[in-house]
Amino acid sequence: MNLNTASGGTVTVSEVAFGKDFNEPLVHQVVTAFLAGARQGSKAQKNRSDVSGGGRKPWRQKGTGRARAGTIRSPIWRGGGKTFAAVPRDHSQKVNRKMYRGALQCIMSELVRQERLVVVDEFTVDSPKTKAVAAKLKGMELTSVLIVTDNVDENLFMASRNLPKVDVRDSQGVDPVSLIAFEKVLITVPALKKLEEALA
């Protein structure tokens, strides 16, 4: 299949990578797993055995008129432990390579169908100035955009990192979440070829 470039030319790409039917359950599962894997998972609380103190019975069992108590660190006491204390855990979910590649194929194909994929010959700036990238994107009428290049140029990275709703990745750094998070995906021809090679 052929894709039109912003300069008026065309580039031939694989039907497998850019002409796949959209599989919503697959994309949902892969995106959910990706976000789950990004969770820190380090939350920790103390249960009644973790809280310091409370080794002695606060008062005798009978004869005081008060409710019986065995420890001052009971979860119903102020300063006591948490009933179901959170422990550090791994939130990651298993996604095999075939599923991950299939989800990326679905997303790229949907971007093509919705005309959200903008192909350019190259995208570079001469200096790390934000206004240089801002002017280029304004000229192309792009506000929310993921820029995918063959190799991330330091000038381009520095110039774009202060712009809201703009991110720069190389072809190996794209992921399902970044591809769907922006209104448009601006990709250079060399990056497109590398991505096609990885997805085909």
Swiss-Prot record:
Q: Which InterPro entries match?
A: Ribosomal_uL4, Ribosomal_uL4-like, Ribosomal_uL4_dom_sf
**Quick one: a GO biological-process term for this protein?**
translation
**Which portions of the sequence form the region Disordered?**
42-69
> Could you give a GO molecular-function term held by this entry?
structural constituent of ribosome
Q: Which GO terms describe its cellular component?
A: ribonucleoprotein complex; ribosome
Q: What are the UniProt keywords, alphabetically?
A: Ribonucleoprotein, Ribosomal protein, RNA-binding, rRNA-binding
This molecule's function is given as:
One of the primary rRNA binding proteins, this protein initially binds near the 5'-end of the 23S rRNA. It is important during the early stages of 50S assembly. It makes multiple contacts with different domains of the 23S rRNA in the assembled 50S subunit and ribosome. Forms part of the polypeptide exit tunnel.
Similarity section: Belongs to the universal ribosomal protein uL4 family.
Quaternary structure and partners: Part of the 50S ribosomal subunit.
Protein's name in the database = Large ribosomal subunit protein uL4
Organism of provenance:
Alcanivorax borkumensis (strain ATCC 700651 / DSM 11573 / NCIMB 13689 / SK2)
Q: What does UniProt list as this organism's lineage?
A: Bacteria, Pseudomonadati, Pseudomonadota, Gammaproteobacteria, Oceanospirillales
Q: Which gene encodes it?
A: rplD
